[in-house]
Amino acid sequence: MDAYIGIDVACKKDKYCPISICVKKDGILIPLQLANERAQSPKGLGNIATLSEVNNLAYATAIKKYILAICKSHQLNPVCIAIDSPLQPRAEHLKRRRAELELDKRKISCYTTPSKADFDNIIVKANRHIASGGKANKLPHSMQIFMLAGFAIANALKDVAPCIEIYPHATVKLLDVAGKHKTKDDQAYIQLQALSKFTGWPSTQCEWDQVPYICKGPTHDKVDAYSAAWIASLAQSDRLALGESEASDAIWLPILEHLIVHTVLQKFTPTAEIMPTKRNKKTPSETNIGEHTKLCPACHAHMFKRWPFGWDAHAAHKCTGVDGVNIEARKRIYKERFL
């Protein structure tokens, strides 16, 4: 069976690289439940380690080994790999890549991909920062350094299957669900609902319950990896290249007008409690008891007096917004969604 792979390149130290491996059944793009596998995707080494070509080669090799192992165990044939990263540095004679200029025309923001010479200077500057005692979280050009890992990953995987560059932010812009940052509130689930109309998954409550197991990592990274796999699964005639694909300078988007729109059962209703945002800590004098009262985000019937205290007992026995009779399974599902 053919496999379509999406990689949300991650370099954060000790963070699993989000990788979604999908198959198509009756036109539905179904992700493997990789978080349940014994083997897990490699962890990022951190931005400082990513400055080293040797480290990036090792990371990319580990990702390749992981993908091949999963495909072998499931008897899958990798057909296309979509990577959320530039596949190579910008050409020296360009100020911005052609793909980035196309994004500019569509008013979609993105970081400029440095050229090889630019990266040489970035590495020197970053190493000087470290040598002078600078903190890792203040590393200059931190939002571009991850691209070095992306280059290595693309190079390592090019003999596994054709690799294409995608940009999840551009994808959700096209789907008209980019109004809020993906890490805020329930935005990742809103984006996944929009995707599901074209992938056919998830379409039932049971499938929504499987979302946490697509791969390791935060929900928004899982959704990015799955959306990448979706574009990898499309025929080339159903994809639009922003830039010049012949020059390996293209970001691919779906051509929605070419695609079947699935009728999916939207049983899952996203709520703001699924992905809580960080809030400033308050002193006891600034906090009143009313701020702790909360309507259950699953059943919308039970009122917690001091959220989230008591969630486990409620989820295990009384909550009508969680399916199933197994107590531990009910608590796990509730915790994955709302805590």
What are these regions (language model features)?
Residues 296-299:
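Short cysteine-rich clusters marking metal-coordination/redox-active sites
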Residues 290-291, 314:
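Flanking scaffold residues of small Cys/His-coordinated metal-binding clusters
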Residues 114-116, 284, 308:
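Short linear motifs centered on Gly/Pro in flexible linkers and helix caps
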Residues 276-287:
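Short Lys/Arg-rich cationic patches that frequently serve as NLS/NoLS or arginine-rich RNA/DNA-binding motifs
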Residues 275, 337-339:
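Short intrinsically disordered terminal tails
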Residues 1-5, 9-277:
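RNase H-like (RuvC/DEDD) metal-dependent nuclease/polynucleotide-processing core
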Residues 307-330, 334:
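C-terminal recognition-helix end and immediately following basic linker
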